[in-house]
């Protein structure tokens, strides 16, 4: 039987406050302005705008999920870095924190007539609350 080696690349997730994640990974799915973008080793160079959504990171030890808000992705053949305005590791997000953040977003969107943004926010929170057991009761 042929032994295929999975190639890894360096993925870094950075907020204005700190380096949130830096590890060799198998793949990353990021929420770009043009849709979900899957990055793997040896990807063509690309700079992409990041929108509100979730980042799925596949590592040798499993999958990690992060909630992100706006930013930029710099993808090279040897790695990928995301600089985002806000990021939360979903496994560290409690229902109380999630409810507080939902309330803040709703307050921000009150009076906003842009249904497209409202639907994106609803889809994003739906993804978070259905993240297959990664959220824990506070």
Curated annotation (Swiss-Prot):
Disulphide linkage map:
none
Mind naming one GO cellular-component term on file for this protein? proton-transporting ATP synthase complex
A GO molecular function term, named singly, is:
ATP binding
The protein's matches in InterPro entries, at most eight in alphabetical order, are given as: ATP_synth_F1_dsu/esu, ATP_synth_F1_dsu/esu_N, ATPsynth_dsu/esu_N
Query: Gene3D superfamilies in the record, alphabetically?
Result: F0F1 ATP synthase delta/epsilon subunit, N-terminal
Q: Does the keyword Membrane apply?
A: yes
What topology in the membrane does the UniProt record assign?
A: Peripheral membrane protein
Which Pfam families has this protein been placed in? ATP-synt_DE_N (PF02823)
Location comes to: Cell inner membrane
Q: Which domain of life is it from?
A: Bacteria
Keywords (alphabetical) are:
ATP synthesis, Cell inner membrane, Cell membrane, CF(1), Hydrogen ion transport, Ion transport, Membrane, Transport
Residue intervals passing through the bilayer: none
Family as reported in the entry's similarity comment:
Belongs to the ATPase epsilon chain family.
Quaternary structure, from the entry:
F-type ATPases have 2 components, CF(1) - the catalytic core - and CF(0) - the membrane proton channel. CF(1) has five subunits: alpha(3), beta(3), gamma(1), delta(1), epsilon(1). CF(0) has three main subunits: a, b and c.
Task: Report the function annotation for this chain.
Answer: Produces ATP from ADP in the presence of a proton gradient across the membrane.
Q: What is this protein called?
A: ATP synthase epsilon chain
Question: From what organism does this protein derive?
Answer: Bartonella quintana (strain Toulouse) (Rochalimaea quintana)
The record's gene field reads atpC
């Amino acid at each position: 039987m042929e032994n295929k080696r999975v190639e890894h690349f360096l993925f870094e997730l950075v907020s204005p406050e700190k380096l949130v994640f830096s590890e060799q990974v198998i793949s990353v799915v990021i929420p770009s302005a043009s849709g979900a973008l899957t990055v793997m080793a040896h990807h063509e160079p690309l700079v992409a705008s990041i929108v509100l959504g979730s980042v799925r990171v596949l590592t040798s030890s499993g999958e990690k999920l992060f909630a992100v808000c706006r930013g930029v992705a710099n993808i090279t053949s040897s790695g990928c870095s995301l600089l985002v305005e806000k990021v939360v590791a979903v496994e560290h997000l409690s229902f109380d924190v999630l409810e507080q953040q939902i309330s803040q977003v709703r307050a921000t969107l009150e009076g906003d007539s842009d249904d497209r943004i409202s639907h994106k926010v609803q889809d994003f929170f739906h993804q978070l609350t259905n993240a297959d057991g990664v959220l824990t009761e506070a």
